[in-house]
Amino acid sequence: MVIIRLARGGSKKRPFYNIVATDSRNRRDGRFIERVGFYNPVATKGESLRIAQDRLTYWQGVGAQLSPTVQRLVKEAQKAQPAA
């Protein structure tokens, strides 16, 4: 089963997450099929969240499930998008 979830990057105390489409059996930071976006929770300036909506829609269309955290981030991105 394909799942869209966060893969952690960055360094100690400075997390950075890639939003990736991956097989659910793979490790959290392991092999993935496609990078769909990113989330930087410690960003002070600039962009902290970017999601390629077209690719997200594609993966959901072929049956990919969203992790609970990614669902929350997608809602957050959709709320922020009309204001921008």
Swiss-Prot record:
SUPFAM superfamilies: Ribosomal protein S16
GO biological process, one term: translation
Keyword Ribonucleoprotein (UniProt): yes
Coiled-coil region: none
UniProt GO cellular component terms: cytoplasm; small ribosomal subunit
Domain of life from the UniProt record: Bacteria
Pfam families on file: Ribosomal_S16
Single GO term (MF): structural constituent of ribosome
Keywords: Ribonucleoprotein, Ribosomal protein
Family: Belongs to the bacterial ribosomal protein bS16 family.
HAMAP family documented for this protein: Ribosomal_bS16 (MF_00385)
Protein name (record): Small ribosomal subunit protein bS16
Lineage: Bacteria, Pseudomonadati, Pseudomonadota, Betaproteobacteria, Burkholderiales
Gene name per UniProt: rpsP
